[in-house]
């Protein structure tokens, strides 16, 4: 009954502008992370860019949460809005954690599977950016939203595979040499895998919203 009633009330569309701004920031963060994973002397520069985009995303998240408290009619349930923007923010937060580890351990070279993961994370960010505008008309876009979330889940699985492959390669490379290099590399892999996990969380939140609205 409440869902039917809400459908006839004017909605605050500013949320979709905020979602778009946040998703664009996440894409920029993922691109900076990808550049960071190329390695070289410019690595700290790209780490700083990741940090800046994470700060920008935090500011937008606060705007969304403030709007949730102040807006009478929201596009969909307030809890769903909070969970969606929080899961998106968690993804770029984890990118920042990756960059922090790189700065802390002064890493300048990255393994090929790490760079492959970086490419997949950019794909994830772009998929989220494609999905969010479709939430303005969920009933018309169920098939596309489902396809996007399924692709996000597949990408998360591919990242898991690359994580395992990369750890095995690190072990074989460093088991008779520098243990610290293995530990540092394993930590970076762990952070990268968590970025993909957070994107999968975004997919789950989108699916939850779709189920609630159709």
Where are these regions (language model features)?
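Cytosolic, long alpha-helical scaffolding segments
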Residues: 1-214
């Amino acid at each position: 009954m409440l869902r039917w009633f809400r459908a006839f009330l004017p909605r605050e569309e500013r949320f979709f502008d905020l979602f778009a701004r946040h998703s664009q920031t996440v894409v920029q963060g993922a691109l900076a992370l990808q550049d960071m994973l190329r390695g070289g002397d410019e690595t700290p520069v790209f780490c700083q860019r990741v940090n800046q985009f994470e700060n920008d995303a935090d500011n937008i998240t606060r705007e969304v949460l403030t709007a949730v408290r102040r807006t009478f009619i929201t596009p969909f349930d307030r809890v769903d809005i909070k969970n969606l923007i929080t899961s998106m923010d968690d993804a770029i937060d984890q990118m920042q954690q990756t960059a922090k580890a790189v700065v802390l351990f002064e890493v300048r070279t990255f393994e090929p599977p790490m760079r492959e993961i970086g490419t997949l994370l950019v794909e994830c960010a772009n998929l989220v950016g494609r999905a969010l505008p479709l939430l303005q008309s969920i009933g018309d876009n169920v098939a596309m939203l489902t396809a996007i979330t399924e692709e996000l889940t597949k990408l998360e699985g591919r990242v898991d595979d690359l994580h395992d492959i990369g750890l095995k390669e690190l072990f074989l490379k460093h088991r008779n040499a520098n243990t610290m290099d293995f530990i540092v590399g394993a930590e970076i892999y762990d952070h990268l895998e968590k970025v993909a996990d957070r994107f999968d969380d975004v997919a789950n939140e989108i699916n939850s919203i779709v189920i609630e609205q159709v």
